[in-house]
From Swiss-Prot:
Keywords: Cytoplasm, GTP-binding, Initiation factor, Nucleotide-binding, Protein biosynthesis
Organism of provenance: Azoarcus sp. (strain BH72)
Entry protein name: Translation initiation factor IF-2
Keyword Cytoplasm attributed: yes
Residue ranges of the region described as G3: 495-498
Gene name of the encoded protein: infB
């Protein structure tokens, strides 16, 4: 190794050069200036000097620890009173550092010196890192040897036996703190504390030792680490054994206490009848002592035989025998008397037990009995709590989740919202779509816009079909799904209704779609349903392509449409936005190709993909009940391939697909992603908008469908019950509201849903539309029976009643109304509700009369002679008495005369005499305002 100067060596040790020169001089190395060079011999001499100066050869240390710990326990004395006993535990341990832990003298001194010289320098830190565990291992090593480390507990002699048990427990419970204290004391001993002084002058060990010595020290350090790890493992094992023994002892103690309490309770129950005064002996009066002697002999023979004897002979005793007979056989006859009763009283003391707080998992619906079982209380407690909350319930009544959680909190337990064991989780586990290969698919395009803006006509031109002419009233009332093969690729179109009643249908269309074509007529501009369509598209996060239709009309103004759409945040590309605007004409076909081009361009940007070789997933677009084929559903396949014969689960319905038809009514065997089909074979008409999934197991599909049906029914019943309880007082305060009960039957699910929602919107505070039943299909006899029982009107939307239902309706007098256009149904129900409204009362002034003279007639009262200033006066009219421009009285005319004759009316310019009903305070100059109250029919 090359030589270095004193300055360089001092810089490496991070100490002043002057201090290093002073140490070198003491070590016998003659260096006069900081520029002098140091050799290896100089460094070795400095190291030997430092070893001698800091006690490298001192005798090995020894440490003695004395530990005192004071605790308190509560124990009962012979009188049964509890008192506090002071328990003091003294422990003394001696720790000796053994020779075999440090090895030979050279390997023991060099690690100590290394640590002394290397703490201050970063350069020397790496060389010392390996031998450092030698210092840490030394005190812990001693703990592993049981002979010298054995503690010497010196407990104070205590009279109580409990203290003798307590001392060893406290010894065993705290080995670690004593050993930790030993390690800390060892670290603070003079042997380890003295080297702290020369830390200001560290020396690099790598410069003083050879590679063989460093390797030997590393082997020694590794040996010590392994030894320490073995000792620590043994210590942990011993602690675990002690903890297990302590836990077993505690369990035995608790078990014995529980048995003692149980026996004490039995003894108390047996002693209760003994409190009554015992009857006299059964023998005769002149031989009472003999019976007592027999009882004493039985007591001497033992409690068990005493009990047997009592049972055989039926001897009446003072309760000890009863106690033995009831299971407390350990208690003999000697336990009687005052001292025995004191012992009983002492043993009956029980510590107060804390209430058990349980975590109760509350599902969406739960019965009162099940809720009580989960809390381990009686059902009557739950019913009492609900009664305090104002709810009268029975033990089998279903509670909703919110109410049940409130009850659980009231009873002091912790409520957790939980779901039932939902078999729907099976669907997530068997999801095969994650591993399937994703391939490009056709875009699903929804055509949306205001009514009569030309959506269906535009699709007609694209499909070269005539659908709009077949729609009732020329407006679309169903959602239609078609796929069109264009030269540029396949596009699936969804045609949604534009009428305001079909909001839910449009929302479903936006949910299932990839691109929205927003149709806006050039001659009409932005209308309410246009704005709603924009909101649906934004809510679904779907890109929009605007088609401005009817540009062939002379009054068309495409620029006005653009300006109005800009105010709705739909900005065209030429204005700097990202929305494509295409002017089209459904009659001439102008711009249709450009529209399809824009749609396919948008689809390429979206990079639409779906799994093809996987079980199908899709969305129910529309559903209806066909008389010959049963439930028929329009399904849009979103991923996977749907095949004939697959088991399909749709909401709460399921079934095996018996047939599949395309939009033209032609049978198909399979349908891939983005292809709409009609399917037959479901168990019931599904709700439009439900998700459909193909399962491999029909049994699992039936289980999930039945579970969903029951869950829906339970939630519905619970909500109805909650609504009844909440609205009870409101209904009592408001009085009975007039309602119009209706039964709605429609051809498809979406139309029935839209009609029910539109009619429900007509309700107000006075009249209400109550849709008792709504379903899909023809009007049946059961519908007529339901209408007859509830007094409802049946509305058939695009459907008819069968022959049996018509005949039954005629005999019952049930009103059945048929509609093809939703406008007509809404208008007629609106007029019916208007007729149910209470008429509005209005006042109409018909004349003004001035009082010119007042006559007072006995037995009649005051009669006014009047002059008609305006209009006319009728007999029985309502009048207001006005004095000094202030209304004084309002009432009716009692009589009206002209001269002496009673008349029906007196016209303007004539005089008359009149009398007011139950009012005589009239004066000359007063005016009477004559008015009538007319009833005016109200409208919604």
């Amino acid at each position: 190794m090359e030589q270095m100067s004193v300055t360089q060596f001092a810089g490496e040790l991070k100490m002043p050069a002057a201090a290093l020169l002073e140490q070198l001089k003491r070590a016998g190395v003659d260096k006069s200036s900081a520029a002098d060079l140091l050799t290896e011999q100089d460094k070795s001499r400095l190291l030997e000097y430092l070893r001698r100066a800091h006690g490298g050869g001192e005798p090995k240390g020894k440490i003695t620890l004395t530990r005192k710990q004071t605790t308190e326990i509560r124990a009962t004395d012979s009188t049964g009173r509890a008192r506090t006993v002071q328990v003091e535990v003294r422990k003394k341990r001696t720790f000796v550092k053994r020779d075999e832990l440090l090895g030979d003298a050279a390997s023991a001194e060099s690690p100590l010196l290394e640590e002394e010289l290397s703490v201050a320098g970063e350069a020397a830190g790496e060389a010392v890192a390996a031998p450092e565990p030698v210092l840490e291992a030394a005190p812990v090593e001693v703990v592993a040897e049981p002979e010298p480390v054995q503690p010497e507990p010196l407990p104070e002699p205590e009279p109580e036996p409990v203290v003798v048990e307590e001392a060893p427990v406290q010894q065993a419970a705290e080995p670690e703190p004593v050993e930790a204290a030993a390690v800390a004391a060892e670290a603070e001993s003079p042997e380890s504390a003295q080297p702290a002084a020369p830390r200001a002058r560290p020396v690099s060990i790598t410069e003083l030792l050879s590679e063989e010595e460093i390797a030997a020290r590393e082997r020694e350090a590794r040996r010590h680490r392994e030894l320490v790890e073995r000792q620590q493992a043994d210590l942990r094992a011993r602690q675990q054994r002690e903890a297990a023994a302590k836990a077993a002892a505690e369990a035995r103690r608790l078990d014995e206490e529980a048995k003692a309490r149980a026996e004490q309770q039995k003894k108390e129950e047996a002693a209760k009848p003994a409190a009554k005064p015992a009857p006299g002996p059964t023998g005769t009066l002149h031989r009472p002592a003999k019976a007592d002697d027999k009882a004493g002999k039985d007591a001497k023979r033992g409690p068990a035989r005493e009990a047997d004897g009592a049972k055989r002979r039926g001897i009446k005793t003072r309760g000890e025998v009863g106690g033995a007979a009831s299971g407390n056989a350990w208690r003999g006859a000697k336990g009687g008397g005052r001292h025995g009763r004191q012992q009983d009283d002492r043993q009956t003391f029980q510590a107060p037990t804390e209430p058990i707080v349980r975590e109760v998992h509350v599902p969406e619906t739960i019965t009162v009995a099940d809720l009580a079982h989960k809390m381990s209380v009686k059902a009557t407690e739950v019913i009492k709590t609900l009664m305090k909350m104002g709810s009268m319930v029975t033990i089998n009544q279903v509670l909703d989740q919110e109410t049940a959680m409130i009850v659980v909190e009231e009873l002091g337990h912790k409520a957790l919202a939980a779901k039932l064991d939902d078999p729907d989780a099976f669907l997530e586990e068997t999801d095969a779509h994650k591993d399937a290969e994703l391939l490009p698919r056709a875009p699903v395009v929804t055509v949306m816009g205001h009514v009569d803006h030309g959506k269906t006509s535009l699709l007609d031109y694209i499909r070269r079909a005539k659908v709009a002419a077949g729609e009732a009233g020329g407006i679309t009332q169903h959602i239609g799904a078609y796929h069109v093969e264009t030269p540029r690729g396949v596009i699936t179109f969804l045609d949604t209704p534009g009428h305001e009643a079909f909001t839910a249908m449009r929302a479903r269309g936006a949910k299932a779609t990839d691109i929205v074509i927003l149709v806006c007529a050039a001659d009409d501009g932005v209308m309410p349903q246009t704005r709603e369509a924009i909101h649906h598209a934004k809510a679904a996060g779907v890109p929009v392509v605007v088609a401005i239709t009817k540009i062939d009309k002379p009054e068309a103004n495409a620029e006005r449409v653009k300006q109005e759409l800009v105010s709705e945040s739909v900005i065209p590309e030429e204005y700097g936005g990202d929305t494509m605007f295409v002017p089209v004409s459904a009659k001439t076909g102008t711009g249709v190709d450009e529209l399809l081009e824009a749609v396919l361009l948008q689809a390429e940007v979206l990079e639409l993909t779906a799994a093809v070789d996987a079980p199908a997933k899709g969305l129910i677009v529309e559903a209806r009940l066909d008389k010959g084929r049963g439930p028929v559903a329009s399904l849009l396949v979103q991923s996977g391939t749907l095949r004939k014969g697959d088991v399909l689960l749709v909401g709460a319905t399921f079934g095996r697909i018996r047939a599949m038809l395309d939009e033209n009514g032609k049978p198909v065997d399979e349908a891939g992603p983005s292809i709409p089909v009609e399917i037959l074979g479901l168990s019931d008409v599904p709700a439009a908008g439900d998700e459909a999934i193909v399962l491999g197991d029909e049994k699992k599909a039936r289980e999930i469908a039945l579970f969903r049906q029951g869950k829906f029914r339970d939630v519905k019943l619970a909500k109805q019950q909650a609504a009844k309880l909440e609205s009870m007082f409101e209904q009592m305060a408001e009085g009975e509201v007039k309602s119009l009960p209706l039964i709605i039957k429609a051809d498809v699910q979406g139309s029935q849903e839209a009609l029910a929602q539109s009619l429900a919107k007509l309700s107000n505070d006075e009249v209400r539309v109550n849709v008792i039943h709504g379903a899909v299909g023809a009007i049946s006899e059961s519908d007529v029976n339901l209408a007859q029982a509830s007094g409802a009107v049946i509305i058939g939307f695009n459907t008819r009643a069968d022959a049996g239902a018509r005949k039954l309706a005629e005999s019952f007098g049930v009103d059945i109304r048929y509609y093809n256009i939703i406008y007509d149904a809404v208008d007629e129900v609106k007029s019916a509700l208007s007729g149910m409204l209470a008429p509005e009362k209005r006042e109409e002034v018909i004349g003004m009369v001035e009082i010119r003279q007042v006559f007072t007639i006995s037995k009649v009262g005051s009669v006014a002679g009047c002059y008609v200033l305006e209009g006319l006066v009728k007999r029985g009219s309502s009048v207001r008495l006005i004095r000094n421009h202030t209304v004084v009285w309002t009432g009716e005319l009692e009589s009206l005369k002209r001269f002496k004759d009673d008349v029906k009316e007196v016209k303007f310019g004539y005089e008359c005499g009149l009398q007011l009903k139950n009012y005589n305070d009239i004066q000359v100059g007063d005016q009477l305002e004559v008015f009538e109250i007319k009833e005016v029919a109200r409208t919604l």
